[in-house]
Amino acid sequence: MSRLGNRAADWADDEEFDDPSALPAQQVTTNKDGTKTVVSYRFNDEGKKVKVTRRIKTTVVREHVNPQVAERRSWAKFGLEKGHAAGPSFDTTSVGENIVFRPSVNWRVQAAEAEKAGPEKGSIKDQLKDKKVKCRICSGEHFTARCPFKDTMAPVDETAAAGAEPGADDVPAAGGLGAGTSSYVPPHLRKGAAAGGERMAGKYEKDDLATLRVTNVSELAEESELRDLFERFGRVTRVFLARDRETQRAKGFAFISFADRTDAARACEKMDGFGYRHLILRVEFAKRAT
């Protein structure tokens, strides 16, 4: 009898009892219209079990990306991620929106003014959303001080000052030492700035004569590819490919500087009308600043 009693106790131990704190497993059902219905359970703030039903529709969005970027995505994972499936791992990667931070030149002053004015002035983002940086030399979306052609091409203001009337030399140099007015005048607009022989371009004058302007460039073009195309005709000293700040794609034009003008002329003759990435390149000498 003792053995039978022990067996009965063992049978009772094998019985499975429902745990009130356990949640049912998630259920995923595929519908006829292609959507999925996901049923899950959770506890709310009051400790009650809540059933959550979600209907998920999968949408495929195709976008054209740089072929080199697509190639890097197909590389096999290495390190701690070696052997994992392609794509980001949700255990180690959090996919979010790519936010690019671009502060303005005087963002500290604007932030201080916004704090003093209060919420009625709006946020800094609302104040700066319509402002864009424009280079005074090549009209690109970057600061003039960072322009790669600042030594070979003159700014627009300097070109206007060079064409000033000769009688302007008699005007006192406002803004200089000992000036009577408090207004500041840039050095290139002061007395004698437009006189002949004072512009010292030096070695960059030669680079200015050997610079080509290439238009109708593909959006997927790279500076290294343009350098390889033009280095066949001579030594290339500088390659500048204008890019869009938001998409980082080429804006359709580039500047190629050669060490020798003869090589630049030969490259202009051969590459003008050349087919590159299903587009016909237009190559000409960059306009020299007067």
Swiss-Prot record:
It is found in: Cytoplasm. Gene3D superfamilies: 3.30.70.330. GO terms for cellular component: eukaryotic 43S preinitiation complex; eukaryotic 48S preinitiation complex; eukaryotic translation initiation factor 3 complex, eIF3e; eukaryotic translation initiation factor 3 complex, eIF3m; multi-eIF complex. It comes from Aspergillus fumigatus (strain ATCC MYA-4609 / CBS 101355 / FGSC A1100 / Af293). The keyword Cytoplasm applies. RNA-binding component of the eukaryotic translation initiation factor 3 (eIF-3) complex, which is involved in protein synthesis of a specialized repertoire of mRNAs and, together with other initiation factors, stimulates binding of mRNA and methionyl-tRNAi to the 40S ribosome. The eIF-3 complex specifically targets and initiates translation of a subset of mRNAs involved in cell proliferation. This subunit can bind 18S rRNA. GO terms for molecular function: RNA binding; translation initiation factor activity. One of its GO terms (biological process) is formation of cytoplasmic translation initiation complex. Keywords: Cytoplasm, Initiation factor, Protein biosynthesis, RNA-binding. The keyword Nucleus does not apply. Residues 210-288 form the RRM domain. This is Eukaryotic translation initiation factor 3 subunit G.
